[in-house]
Amino acid sequence: MSEYTVFMKDADEKTYEELAKIPGLRIGEGRVVGRIDACAAAARLLGVKAPPQLQPVDLPLPDGLRDYQVEGVKRLNAIVKEMGGALLADDMGLGKTRQATALAAGLTKKSGRVLVVCPAYVRETWLDELSKWGERSVTVIRPGNTKRHVRAWEEAKTAKWVVCSYEMAGKVYEECFYDAPRALIMDEGHLVKGRDAKRAKKLEEIGKFATYRLLMTGTPMWSRPRDFYQLLRILFGSAFGTKFNFDVRYCGGRINDWGGLDNRGVSNAEELQHRLSYYMVRREKRDVLKELPPLTRQVIWCDPTAEATREFQAAMRGFGAGAVSDALNATLRGKVEPVLDYAQQARRFLLFTYMKEHAHQIAELLRTKRDTPCVLITGDLPVEKRASLIAQARSSGQGVVATIDSAGAGLNMQGVASVGIMHAIDWVPLKLAQAEARLHRMGQTEPVQWVYFAMRESMDSVVVRNVVEKLGQWAAIMGQQSNRDLMDTLGDTVDGRTEKDVLADIYRDLQEGGDNGDED
């Protein structure tokens, strides 16, 4: 035991290649294991299970699945049989819904029911997918109190498949599942985060009683490594320890000057990546869709007009969170004209912005001042109408103007355009990745170019650096090349200053009454 204690003191500094060379590890007094590979060595040192081996699959796999999807279902089946849950984190556009449907259909072939929890905007996607499979016992719960809605609630008490939104999951479970579901599927599962969130607690409760749990998301680490924890807890219980231990181990957790825990960083990334591989299936488009057309990116830094500079400086002289919001709005207004120029030239495009006010303004200016027809999608548009507008744009050749929160995820827009325009660079980098994937996915035949518009001497100088930092954390843990490419594209356009340095320079210039110097 003393040898093991000595070894563990510096185990954190050893690479997995070094661990693999150890002929035996003393993991308990009087018990020695033989030579093991790096993965198993890490598993034993960390107290977690080794990766489950692929087992012969007794699932009814339908025709039409691609080879990588068949392999994905096999792997998921092995993981859920071993661990009780699995994380399906394939890149956007690789058919996660189809794989999840195949898995759940197989797991409930003889008996059992499936509860699918998803954002409202993908309810119809699930209904379409289940219909393609020939599933007849499907009930979709929608908000409302008409006779049709009341009938759906009654049907949900016996239906094999029940599909509902995250907001309604708790009520659906309590009123329609007298016996726990055999399979619980959480689509766009990154929406479940925040240890104290009511939604997360309810899903954790449901998950404890479900036989199998599957969480689907192309962006499991929504912003920072700390976002993983709640997802992992719902799927695997205490396998990753307490939230505090997770933050300290993997999120660079440290006590700050105010006595709180700062968990915004990343630490032991290789170790976390290794552990996640036991529980997760993840493939990139570039690795499995060889026929997918290329994706390129460009960043265009716009010079601010005198009016934009005045608005931005006036906003930054304010105080509190409102000042940041005002500064972001000033930045977005300052980029409208160059964005209009680019969209007018492209004619067919997908344009994302941040707020519906900006989306309405851009769409109106394109239609009335630039002779550029387009459809408009914002959050106040009913979910059912969004897909029809996309189909209209695809058939008519019109552009699409949308807010990133209303159309940046869950909607298939391949064939709508080959040019994507990012008017607003979101603080959450994985929103950008999801938005890019609306075009760059199965069914797209033309090369896709995404153009990011940023304005010098504005909040974009801060936001871009913040996004680059977060993408670096993602790449360290997930090892995903496409997000590393986005990080490099944005990072190559800025200098070595941190976002704090840039903010300090902005405030210093304001105090001195002058303008910023050349940016980037």
Locate each region found by the language model.
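Conserved pre-motif I regulatory segment
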Residues: P51-A89
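Conserved Walker A/P-loop ATP-binding site and its immediately adjacent core
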Residues: S111-K132, W222-D227, M355-K356
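Conserved helix-turn-beta segment of the N-terminal RecA-like "Helicase ATP-binding" lobe
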Residues: V122-N145, L235-A239
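Conserved P-loop NTPase motor "coupling/switch" region that bridges the ATPase
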Residues: K147, K157-T158, A183, A200-K285, ...
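Conserved helicase ATPase core of P-loop NTP-dependent helicases/translocases
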Residues: R148-A152, F352, H360-Q361, D371-A407
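SF2 helicase motor core recognition
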Residues: G170-E174, S223-P225, A359-A363, R386-I390, ...
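Conserved helicase/translocase motor-coupling segment
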Residues: D287-T368, R386
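A conserved SF2-helicase RecA2
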Residues: W427-E436, H440-E519
